[in-house]
Amino acid sequence: MHFIALIVAVCVAFAGASCPYSSGGIAAPPCPKNYLFSCQPNLVPAPCAQEAASYGSAGAYAEHIPFYVGYPNHQQVEQYQERIARAALIDGLRGLTQGIQDQQY
């Protein structure tokens, strides 16, 4: 285990000695002057949005707060099952009516 650590340390030392960190000879390009965001220190914050009359003082940032529903109670489950059964019955009656109309012609 110590041998592997020694080999890794030697490799790191050799790599550090063979790769000197010197600045390159390429200069940075000049700062652009006609862009919205540049490297010049004269940026100013954007102005605040005007108050919208229909939203009141909240402006356009008003949004509904989501809430999480819990488990449905027994009555809600029964109402849901009744609606599903009624929808299936209506769908079946539509199919039956369509079949009768197709047979008449």
From Swiss-Prot:
Protein family (similarity comment): Belongs to the vitelline membrane family.
Any one of the GO BP annotations: vitelline membrane formation involved in chorion-containing eggshell formation
Molecular function terms from GO: structural constituent of vitelline membrane
Keywords in alphabetical order: Secreted, Signal
Primary gene name: Vm32E
Subcellular compartments: Secreted
Organism of provenance: Drosophila ananassae
Residue ranges occupied by any VM domain in the UniProt entry: 25-62
Name recorded for this polypeptide: Vitelline membrane protein Vm32E
